[in-house]
Every structure is written in structure tokens, then in C-alpha cells.
């Protein structure tokens, strides 16, 4: 037996093959390949066990592309959704570009009742493409959802190939099917490409989306009317036409091969077109040469980016409020990039440095002056740290929210706090508090939290920029701050990163000019020059210039917002995995080796070759700019909220980074006018800041970015926590991470409830109960094999379940058992345990309670949990008759233990 020595460790060929399988999964290499590499004289262990790199041969695309769509029906009682119809249309892309109305080149080509049949049709297209040697494109308008049914595409799934551009970390936006060397069929997400709903696309192209009755629950075995098919085909035609009409806006798109994967790609390519070659080259060189990134700094920056401020006021959670005013910031994130300072170096590293030393004794002066006025804050930074900026890991001792009462909003996310075990271990330990009083929310760490936000803490360690630290000092009393690991940067004022700022100002001016034209006004020459010549020519020659300007306005908004996405895009995602029919990108598994390989070899190497692909990839290395844009947007909200707290009687019942919902229990016309005056004063300060910044010379009355605009007043409003609120004022606005609006229309739910209610208000309250009360949402008749994966896939429990896939909607509240009363039973240990006990009893250490979910089915309990940073799935067969709606009926653990044993 041959023994090989690597770094003083001995391996056999079998050991090396096992190591390759452990590190690379299904892409691993076998013993024969490893043996050949050793015989060639390879000495690097990583090179010996790394996967084979398959060269993908570039082939031409067929000009014929397809758009497919599923029609789904939701069961309100079980929250289960299944497909009952699929339609496909095809179009000639080249003809669509040259035809005034591309609607005429789109034609229906296939429909079926079961997802499996659609998979067979796609396999036929795959074989045709392989025979003709032309790649075929297919679009779904929400591939992340529609691909939930793809596990029934048995004939096609064997050709699935994993490519680097597969997933954005959550849902797939490109699926490649091929023979191992060449890709013959691509399925892409048109929603990622267009950033619009089908209804919005229809309005834009003049072919509106049809109306449809979603109240009726339909199955694949039900007879459908002609209109059902027309509706589905129309959605496909609208999407296909929208793709071609979008591509007409860009002069550099000549054929189907030029269609980018996402809308951000549109913007990246347009950047190169609108900036001079010298500026584009300078910007690309600047990002790479100035910000060489290492793994540790990237992990810190990812931590800094986490911890959004989205939050609901704990004193008003679940309560029905009337006359709630909504204020929204116009292009909050990208507007910050046109006004603020950014780092101009990668940063000098400091370790275990007291923050006071870096701030040269001006700490108190900073607290007193810079937080009172946003303009002063800009000036104070340069006095404070001599024009330096910093980000890193900070330890805060004895922190406590300043204003405990109705009008306070904590901003330190519990998910952003870090344990003392190491840089990579995030400590969540967030309790499922429900509606308990705040005084009861004390954990064993002397931490007081409110719905995932820190109220007080003896000691916590967080990732932050100095902007975040200033935000914290405004909202919290802090005994001391020290920096465990700090990157100190020089702040580049007087224009900041000129290329970045110039690029964003062009988009800002474009948006402002198009808004003026769509309102029948004539913008000045400076603003007009920012509009692309083709767009301006089309508007002038169009019979309805305001309507066309509005269409281009929406496009410019998406481009402007995409700029923030470009800057804040993560540099490296984890490996793409296939697990139980579910395809995910495991961001938790990012290793130092993976980062170094991707960042240094791919981004830097390709960038220095000055290829187009390299230049675009290098733009992503402005990640640090995205971090500061986010921090500035958060500070914008903190300053606004502090003004509301101190200058008005209004209460913020809900906020996210670019909006706030304000409520006054005894409002009058006087108090509302006072509120508007205070908001107006704040907006004037934004204009002053913009004028004093050296990034751009703007006319105050022409620049509307960064202002808090009054949107509307809701007759009824209620919020539970982050990203979960409902508002009603004639039309229902629902934002929730649990109720999927695309598949369970809230208007349908209201109609359903209205039949049993006397008013819309009663319906609204009933919908609150359905959305946010566990015991009204769970139905233990749900049965059938369940795939506990990222999409929570399931199967309909009926006679045609083998043909029709169904998904249980991704949610953070349905089927979720309270942690204190949650039961856990395994085949190895015939016992029921409290959740707090099971962590160490079964797994040996604490589970991540924030991301552990229990799912109940007739056959037993499914658990999706995270352990040591990895997602695991366990299904425990057991008798769930002792449960009702996820709540333990009996307090006697011994009774249940005997039953299950």
C-alpha cells in the first residue's frame, strides 16, 4: 500500500479520494485521477484532490427563445400551493428587435396540465438544440418559485450542469443543461432581468395583464375554460414582448447572445457606454489596486453589512392603528453615493486598540456636536480623526437604550452581535418572545432584547463602521468602546471617488429630468444632457411624450438603484449544492481557500488582462463603497427618527432603512401640519448637506434625492416585526416574509373573509389573525412526503400527487413551534425533551435558535437546524396527536414520553 506524506500527515490513495469527496462533494475526483496526478509529480495537496475543470465550449444561440409560466392555486386552509396549468410561447428575437411592436412575433406553442409534462417538452427542446448545435433560451418570470416544480422534470434533470453564474445566494436565476462540455439549454429568470412584475411590463408595452379569478381553487384534473388558457398565454406573451422591448433601449444589443443575465448587467454595460474610456479604465484600476481584499477583512465587511434597522415598535406590535402616515426616502441608497465621503485606501490594520486613542480625546466633542446636525457630522469627521474612516470589530460595554418608551427604536441587531469564541461564530440566541412584556425578555447573558434588537447588554461585540458607531452613540448610552480589529482608512473628500460619483450623478440627473418631462415640465439643459440620445429622440418624436418619458423614468430608477446593488454585491458566494431536489448556494460554507482562489485568481487576474469581462468583474471590488453607502443610509434614518422623537408628538410604529410609518393616537390638523413642517426642515438640511458636499454642484430646487417624502395615510395599519406589516386604505398593502403575495393574493384572502364579515375592518382583523396566529394557520391534515429544504417543498396529498408538485410557502411563522414547549424525539433516544435540553442532549452543543424551525406533519416532526454553520435536516417519525397547531396540549412530559417510547 502506497503512503503519501503531506504536511506531516500520512494519506493512502483511498484517504485522498475520501478527502476530495468531503471537500468537493459530487465534483470530487476518484482514486485513478489522484494516482495519475501523483505520477505526474504533483506535490500540492489542494491540486491533487481538486475537481476536474471542464472546459465549456462557446456555441451560438438560436434566435428563437421561449417563455413559460405556471398557473398555481393556493389552499388557504393548508397554505399549500400547486400547479394546475403550464403554457409556453416562442418568439424570434431578431424579428422582435426590428419590429415596431414585438407583440406580433410572439406565438403560443405548448400547454399542459402537469409540471412533469412540461419537463418532457423542455427535454425535446434540449435534444433539438443539441442536434442543431444552437443553444436555446427559456425564461420563467420567477424562476426561484417555478423551479420548485422541477423535481418532476425527470427526463431533463439528468442534464443539469452547475456553473459559476448559477445563483445569487438564495434563488436560482440561471439553470444550464448540457452534456458535460457544452450547454444546449438555458433557463433564466426574466424577473431578475426586467425587475418588473408582469402587470408593470404589460402597462409599459401597451398590452396589459388580464384579470383573473383567484378565489377558485383549481386542480390539474379540473376542466378549464378557454379563458384560463388565454390568461396564462397572455402572461407569457407579455413577458416575451417585455424582454424584446427592453433590449431595444440598448444600442449595444444586436442579437440574442447580448442579452445579459440580470438587470444589473444592463447597468454595468451601460456604465461603460456613458463614461469615457479613460474614466472607466481609471475606475476599474482604482478598485483593484486600492482595495486588495483578504479573507479576514471580507468576513468583517460582511458582518458590517448585516443587521438592518427594519423593525416594528414593540409597544404597538399586533395592534391596530388608525391614520398612520407613511414617509419614504427617494432613492435613499444611491443618493448617498452622490453626497458622502468614501475610503481611498484599503486600510491600515490595528488590533486591540482603545477607540479613544484613535479619536484623539475628542470623543465627548463628537457626541455633543456631530450628532445634532448632519452637516456638522461631515465637518466633525475630519476634525475627529484627521480625515480618516474606519471599520472593524468593536466591543461595547454596558450599553442601554437612551429613551425607553413608546418613542424609541433600538438599532443593534441581535444577529449582528458576535460571541467571544471567534470571528466567524455569530451568536444569535434570540428568544421567541411573542407578546411578552419587555421586562421578561432577559437572557442568561444579561441581555435585554426587543424583537431581535438589543435594548441593553453588559458587553457585546459587533461589526461596524465609524458611521454605525456614531448611530449607536446617538441611540444608546455606552460606558466604553474598544476595537478588537480595526481597519483605518483615509477619507477622500473633495469629490470622493470621482468616477463612482460622476457615474451616479448621471443617473440621478437622468431620473430627475425624466420625472420632469413625465409631469409636463421642461428640465434645464444640464439635466437633459444626462438622458441618452436615443431616449430623448424617441420622446420628442412620440405622439405621447409624457407617457414614454414615464416608461423611461421607471427604467432610469431601476438603473440608479442597480448602482447600489453593484457596489454592495457580495464578492464571493459559497459553493452551489444540490440536495434533495433543492438547489442552493451555501454562503455559510465560504472557506479561506475558496475566497482566495476566486478573488485573487479570478477577479484580479482577469482584471489585469483588461478584458471586458475582467473590467466588469473588477467593479464588484467596490464592496467597501457599498458598505459605507448602507451605513450612511442608516444614519439618515437615525437622524430623521431622532428629529421625530424630539420635535413632534408622533410615534414611529414601523421603520426600515428608507421609510417610516408615523402614528399619533389623538391626531389633529395642527399636529399633522407640525409634523410636515418638521419633515420639511429635515429635508432642507439634506439639501444643505448636498450643497456643501464637494461631490456635485446641484440646484437645491432640482434635487429631490434623499428627502423623506410624504406618501400616503393608511386608514388601518398593524405591524408585527421586521418585514411584516399590513396597511389598508381602500387597497391592501401587505409586506411579510411569510405570506407569498405572488401565490396567495391578499385581495383574494380579503374577499374570502369578507363573506363572513360585516365590514372591511372586520376582514382586516380576521386577516391579521390568519397571518400572525399560529393556531389558525396550521392544519394537521397536511400529509405526504415532505422535502424539508430551502423552498420547503411538499407534495399534494391526492391521487395525482406523483405528477403534480406543490410547495409549502417559505415562512418564518407557519408550523413553527414555540421553543420552550417544542418537543424533540429521535429514533436513537426514545424520549421527548424540551427544546432547551435537546441542544446538548442530542447534538452536544447549542443550536442556533434563530434559524431552527420545526415542521409538523401526520408522519411526525421535521427539523431544519444549523449546527457549526451547516444546515441539517432531520425527520423524526412520531405521534403528533398530542399537538394542536404546533402547541403542546399536555404539560406532562412523562405522558408523552411513554406514548412515544
Regions found by a protein language model. Name each.
Residues 199-285, 637, 658:
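Acidic, Mg2+-coordinating catalytic module of metal-dependent nucleases/exonucleases
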Residues 98-220, 224, 230-238:
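Conserved DEDDh/DEDDy metal-dependent 3′-5′ exonuclease domain
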Amino acid at each position: 500500500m502506497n503512503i503519501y506524506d503531506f504536511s506531516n500527515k500520512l494519506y493512502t490513495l483511498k484517504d485522498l479520494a475520501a478527502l476530495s469527496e468531503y471537500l468537493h462533494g459530487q465534483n470530487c475526483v476518484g482514486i485513478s485521477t489522484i494516482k495519475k496526478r501523483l505520477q505526474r509529480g504533483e506535490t500540492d495537496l489542494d491540486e491533487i484532490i481538486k475537481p476536474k475543470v471542464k472546459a465549456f465550449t462557446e456555441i451560438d444561440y438560436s434566435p428563437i427563445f421561449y417563455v413559460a409560466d405556471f398557473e398555481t392555486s393556493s389552499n388557504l386552509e393548508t397554505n399549500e400551493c400547486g400547479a394546475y396549468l403550464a403554457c409556453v410561447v416562442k418568439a424570434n428575437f431578431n424579428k422582435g428587435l426590428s419590429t415596431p411592436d414585438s407583440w406580433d412575433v410572439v406565438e403560443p406553442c405548448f400547454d399542459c396540465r402537469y409540471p412533469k409534462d412540461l419537463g418532457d417538452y423542455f427535454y425535446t427542446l434540449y435534444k433539438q438544440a443539441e442536434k442543431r448545435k444552437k443553444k436555446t433560451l427559456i425564461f420563467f418570470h420567477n424562476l426561484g418559485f417555478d423551479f420548485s416544480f422541477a423535481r418532476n422534470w425527470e427526463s431533463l434533470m439528468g442534464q443539469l450542469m452547475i456553473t459559476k453564474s448559477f445563483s445569487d445566494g438564495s434563488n436560482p436565476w440561471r439553470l444550464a443543461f448540457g452534456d458535460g462540455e457544452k450547454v444546449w439549454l438555458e433557463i433564466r429568470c426574466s424577473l431578475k432581468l426586467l425587475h418588473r412584475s408582469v402587470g408593470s411590463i404589460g402597462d409599459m408595452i401597451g398590452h396589459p395583464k388580464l384579470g383573473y379569478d383567484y378565489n377558485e381553487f383549481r386542480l390539474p384534473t379540473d376542466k378549464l375554460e378557454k379563458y384560463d388558457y388565454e390568461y396564462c398565454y397572455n402572461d407569457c406573451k407579455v413577458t416575451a414582448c417585455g424582454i424584446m422591448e427592453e433590449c431595444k433601449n440598448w444600442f449595444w444589443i444586436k442579437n440574442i447572445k447580448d442579452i445579459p443575465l440580470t438587470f444589473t448587467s444592463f447597468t454595468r454595460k451601460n456604465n461603460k457606454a456613458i463614461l469615457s474610456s479613460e474614466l472607466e479604465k481609471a475606475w476599474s484600476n482604482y478598485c483593484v489596486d486600492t482595495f486588495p481584499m483578504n479573507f479576514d477583512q471580507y468576513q468583517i465587511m460582511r458582518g458590517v453589512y448585516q443587521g438592518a434597522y427594519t423593525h416594528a415598535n414593540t409597544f404597538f406590535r399586533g395592534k391596530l392603528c388608525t391614520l398612520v402616515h407613511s414617509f419614504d426616502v427617494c432613492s435613499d441608497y444611491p443618493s448617498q453615493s452622490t453626497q458622502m465621503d468614501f475610503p481611498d485606501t484599503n486600510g491600515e490594520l490595528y488590533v486591540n486598540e482603545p477607540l479613544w486613542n484613535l479619536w484623539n480625546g475628542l470623543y465627548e466633542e463628537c457626541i455633543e456636536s456631530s450628532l445634532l446636525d448632519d452637516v456638522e457630522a461631515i465637518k466633525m469627521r475630519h476634525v475627529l480623526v484627521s480625515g480618516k474612516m474606519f471599520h472593524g470589530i468593536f466591543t461595547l460595554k454596558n450599553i442601554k437604550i437612551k429613551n425607553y418608551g413608546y418613542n424609541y427604536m433600538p438599532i443593534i441587531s441581535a444577529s449582528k452581535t458576535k460571541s467571544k469564541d471567534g470571528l466567524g461564530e455569530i451568536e444569535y440566541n434570540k428568544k421567541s418572545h411573542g407578546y411578552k412584556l419587555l421586562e421578561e425578555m432577559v437572557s442568561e447573558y444579561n441581555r435585554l432584547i426587543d424583537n431581535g434588537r438589543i435594548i441593553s447588554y453588559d458587553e457585546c461585540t459587533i461589526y461596524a463602521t465609524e458611521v454605525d458607531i456614531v448611530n449607536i452613540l446617538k441611540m444608546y448610552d455606552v460606558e466604553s468602546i474598544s476595537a478588537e480589529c480595526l481597519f483605518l482608512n483615509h477619507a477622500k473628500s473633495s469629490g470622493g471617488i470621482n468616477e463612482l460619483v460622476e457615474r451616479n450623478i448621471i443617473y440621478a440627473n437622468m431620473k430627475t429630468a425624466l420625472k420632469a418631462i413625465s409631469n409636463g415640465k421642461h428640465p434645464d439643459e444640464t439635466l437633459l444632457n444626462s438622458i441618452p440620445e436615443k431616449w430623448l429622440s424617441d420622446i420628442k418624436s412620440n405622439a405621447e411624450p409624457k407617457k414614454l418619458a414615464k416608461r423611461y423614468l421607471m427604467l432610469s430608477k431601476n438603473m440608479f438603484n442597480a448602482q447600489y446593488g453593484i457596489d454592495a454585491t457580495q464578492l464571493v458566494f459559497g459553493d452551489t449544492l444540490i440536495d434533495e431536489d433543492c438547489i442552493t448556494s451555501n454562503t455559510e460554507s465560504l472557506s479561506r481557500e475558496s475566497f482566495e482562489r476566486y478573488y485573487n485568481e479570478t477577479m484580479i487576474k482577469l482584471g489585469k488582462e483588461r478584458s471586458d469581462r475582467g473590467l466588469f468583474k473588477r467593479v464588484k471590488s467596490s464592496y467597501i463603497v457599498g458598505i459605507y453607502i448602507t451605513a450612511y443610509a442608516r444614519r439618515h434614518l437615525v437622524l430623521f427618527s431622532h428629529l421625530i422623537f424630539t420635535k413632534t408628538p408622533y410615534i414611529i410604529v414601523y421603520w426600515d432603512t428608507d421609510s417610516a410609518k408615523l402614528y399619533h393616537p389623538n391626531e389633529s390638523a395642527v399636529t399633522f401640519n407640525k409634523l410636515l413642517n418638521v419633515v420639511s426642515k429635515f429635508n432642507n438640511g439634506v439639501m444643505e448637506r448636498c450643497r456643501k458636499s464637494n461631490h456635485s454642484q446641484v440646484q437645491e430646487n432640482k434635487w429631490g434625492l434623499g428627502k423623506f417624502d410624504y406618501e400616503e395615510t393608511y386608514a388601518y395599519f398593524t405591524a408585527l416585526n421586521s418585514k411584516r406589516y399590513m396597511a389598508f386604505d381602500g387597497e391592501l398593502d401587505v409586506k411579510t416574509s411569510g405570506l407569498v403575495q405572488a401565490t396567495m393574493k391578499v385581495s383574494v384572502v380579503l374577499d374570502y373573509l369578507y363573506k363572513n364579515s360585516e365590514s372591511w375592518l372586520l376582514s382586516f382583523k380576521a386577516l391579521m389573525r390568519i397571518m400572525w396566529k399560529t393556531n389558525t394557520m396550521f392544519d394537521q391534515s397536511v400529509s405526504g412526503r415532505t422535502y424539508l429544504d430551502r423552498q420547503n417543498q411538499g407534495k399534494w396529498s391526492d391521487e395525482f400527487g406523483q405528477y403534480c408538485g406543490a410547495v409549502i410557502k417559505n415562512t418564518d411563522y407557519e408550523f413553527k413551534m414555540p421553543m420552550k414547549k417544542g418537543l424533540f424525539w429521535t429514533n436513537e433516544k426514545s424520549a421527548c425533551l424540551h427544546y432547551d435540553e435537546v441542544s446538548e442532549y442530542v447534538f452536544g452543543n447549542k443550536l442556533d435558535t434563530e434559524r431552527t424551525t420545526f415542521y409538523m406533519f401526520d408522519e411526525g416532526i421535521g427539523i431544519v437546524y444549523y449546527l457549526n454553520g451547516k444546515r441539517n435536516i432531520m425527520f423524526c417519525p412520531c405521534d403528533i396527536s398530542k399537538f394542536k397547531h404546533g402547541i403542546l396540549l399536555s404539560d406532562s412530559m412523562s405522558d408523552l414520553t411513554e406514548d412515544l417510547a
